Amino acid sequence: MDKRIYLCLAHMSGKEQGFIKEAFDTNWVVPLGPNVNAFEDELKHFVGQDKEVVALSAGTAAIHLGLIQLGVGAGDEVICQSFTFCASANPVAYQGAKPVFIDSEEDTWNMDPVLLEEAIKDRILKTGKKPKAILPVHLYGMPARIDEICAIAAKYEIPVLEDAAEALGSEFKGQKCGTFGTFGVLSFNGNKMITTSGGGALIVPDESTKKQTMFYATQAREPFPHYQHEKIGYNYRMSNICAGIGRGQMTVLDEHIAHHRHVHALYENAFEGVDGITLKSNPDGRFNANYWLSTILIDPVKTGTNYDEVRRKLDERGIETRPLWKPMHLQPVYATNPCYVNGVSERLFNMGLCIPAGPWVTDEDVVYIVEQIKGCCKK
């Protein structure tokens, strides 16, 4: 194949430039303006649940502002999912707090509710206080067992900051991911379901919290004619130009989600009955993943190969793949942090690959990808 097949490239609707041109024509080229307001309104309507949304410079910024508003600070502990990208945990460290890592369960690959409760009890026993927040992730767009996680959080009166950066449009029991916790986080990085070039959003419970979030995101400037600052603030607001890209992307969001699910369905059919290759799919009818990235596990015993050999061979054949996230409790930067593990994430990391699923991936591409994977795995 002459072309290279990528995991998930940005796909423009064709309407983005109109919103950007309007921003230039009206000189709204700053981190506020009509595009920002409209983009936030469109996201609010999409996620539902009477939530408000604040557009920000990154999903990482959204996590950081959520933690700040939950009062996370020096000496606190925040329970974090281990099997995920570092941006979920790093903002905890920004605040001088300590991430406590929880391993995954098999059904969704997300935070294990059983380990979560064990960890809460153990942290209370060892530190004399409960964790300040719980930060589950909907990995690769697969909803976590968020009902169980939220029930445990409510039992111990610990707020939930929900990382739905990879899960825009994913649902659990018909409710959008990112709307279950006190706060929810979205990402619009260049490889996500929609993009604003770079950007993110914080889903908040009400209008007053939205105003407070915007206050922190604009350097915590007080309402004085001069520049008055009584709290530490941040430069986290989204540009009106980037929000224009987001508005154009919102017109094809449903189409993007449908395409990712279609590609996954093709993979599901193609890998059915293939010994040694397991495609990750919804555990049951409560889960409705957006399948931001499709993921497979490669059993080295049954296939006679391993995920890294397959990755290298596919790369030579023009197919981009990526290993699954290396668990945070194995990362050198967090080597001394408390962790509660069951072996699931380490096993997944040593067996798994992300395979192409984005809007540019065609049905013919899927046929080629599957053929190449099967060819790599023949004993």
Task: Name the predicted role of every residue range.
Residues L32-E77, P91-A93, F101-D103, K126, ...:
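Phosphate-binding glycine-rich loop
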Residues P34-D41, D50-K51, V114-E118, L125-K129, ...:
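PLP-dependent aminotransferase class I/II
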Residues N90-V92, I152, K176, I241:
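Hydrophobic/aromatic ligand-binding patch that stacks against planar heteroaromatic rings
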Residues D107-T196, A201-I203, S208:
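Active-site phosphate-binding strand-loop segment of PLP-dependent enzymes
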